[in-house]
A protein has these predicted regions:
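Sequence/fold signature of self-assembling virion shell proteins
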Residues: 174-252
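Extended, solvent-exposed, turn-rich assembly/linker loops in the middle of proteins
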Residues: 116-182, 186
Length: 252
């Protein structure tokens, strides 16, 4: 009696996670593939004068500009052609699923080494002990208010922080107690087993383009390869750039 080998059915990849930088950040303007120039919108204390005083024509606050460059993200997939799996589709869906991580890691660390501002250029506000996230968030928001003189600020946290923030009502939807947006991203690094770092920055912009996928079938060894690539950019107003560490119990 002959036996028939049943073919498995390839499952569809789940949709990329919602939220994160790509779900919350402001859309980068057209032409972002040439790079973005972000003026330091908030870095300038307003001058209070009597309205009858004649002002001098000398600007007190000179505009500073930060430059952010685009970068590439790539993923790949390979398998025997005998598997009959769509490697081109696999590579593209893998790219879609991991783009958020790549964009967030670039914002946090300038992992590509482009010289763009990142969280690592921020100013430390110290360490808060015993999981006191209320004090940590309050300290961050006050620092942002003082540095930006009223300009918008955005709060950032790794996934590990989300449960702590939600329990203390510091993550209402995606808003802080003052109404600033939170970005909780899978790509933000955790500092250690007992330390969670939170950041605050100026406004954030991000964009990615559609994937470009290359597929190659090596018939000599039946190897099916696919490479998915896309361009991305992430930028923020670095006038506000602070971080604070919070100590927590070690995970099991």
């Amino acid at each position: 009696m002959s036996q028939t080998l049943m073919e498995g059915v390839e499952v569809e990849a789940p949709a990329p996670r919602s939220g994160g930088i790509l779900g919350v950040a402001l859309p980068a303007p057209q032409g972002w593939m040439q790079g973005l120039s972000i003026p330091f919108y908030g870095c300038g204390e307003p001058v209070l004068v009597d309205r009858c005083v004649t002002a001098e024509d000398n600007p007190l606050n000179k505009t500073a500009v930060a430059e952010f460059n685009p970068f590439a993200i790539t993923q790949s997939a390979t398998c025997s052609s005998l598997s009959r799996l769509d490697q081109k589709k696999h590579a593209e869906e893998r790219l879609d699923s991991t783009t958020e991580w790549a964009v967030a890691r670039q914002l946090a660390t300038d992992d590509v080494g482009l010289g763009s501002p990142s969280f690592e250029d921020g100013t430390s506000l110290g360490t808060v002990a015993d999981g006191d996230f209320v004090l940590a968030v309050g300290t961050l928001e006050q620092a942002a208010a003082d540095a930006g003189f009223g300009t918008q600020w955005w709060l950032h946290a790794p996934v590990k922080a989300a449960a702590f923030l939600a329990r203390l009502d510091l993550l209402n939807g995606r808003w802080s107690p003052t109404g600033a947006p939170w970005i909780i991203s899978v790509g933000y690094p955790v500092q250690g087993a007992t330390t969670i770092r939170l950041w605050v920055t100026g406004s954030v912009w991000a964009a990615v383009d559609d994937p470009f996928v290359l597929n190659d079938l090596d018939r000599r060894n039946n190897n099916d390869e696919a490479f998915a690539n896309r361009s991305a950019i992430v930028a923020f107003d670095p006038c506000i750039n602070f971080y604070i560490d919070v100590t927590v119990p070690a995970s099991p």
